[in-house]
Amino acid sequence: KNSGLESGLMIVQYVAGASLAELHGHAMPRSAFSTSTSAGQEDHVSMGATACWNLLVATERLSEVLACELFVACEALEFEQLQPAAHVRSLKQRVRVISPPLDGDRSTSKELKKIANELWQGGWLARIEAECGRLPR
């Protein structure tokens, strides 16, 4: 709202960019790093456990990126007089319980973390579909 005095959503963009950069790092296939072991008697180590760990961390980073996108989308809806679809309205209401609309610069780190956690746990989809009907798959 106050260009030049407030940063708006700039920091949210930085957070999303940092999480996305880390997500790219976790997308590298672990099988590319197989190594011989047991004095050369074993020529393959699957790195399956490492790949699973990277998948878990990657889903956490993805939830952070999506939380930033969702946060920005909810802010954008504050400036439009349009009525979004029922599922979007329900999702926005859930976000607004965690994060009220911006009325100036403030730290949103705790809010973004809570939104990311809700997305990562996956409970919102079931509750929104129970309220508004099943989304097409």
Task: Kindly label every feature range from the protein language model.
Residues 1-137:
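C-terminal auxiliary extensions adjacent to catalytic cores
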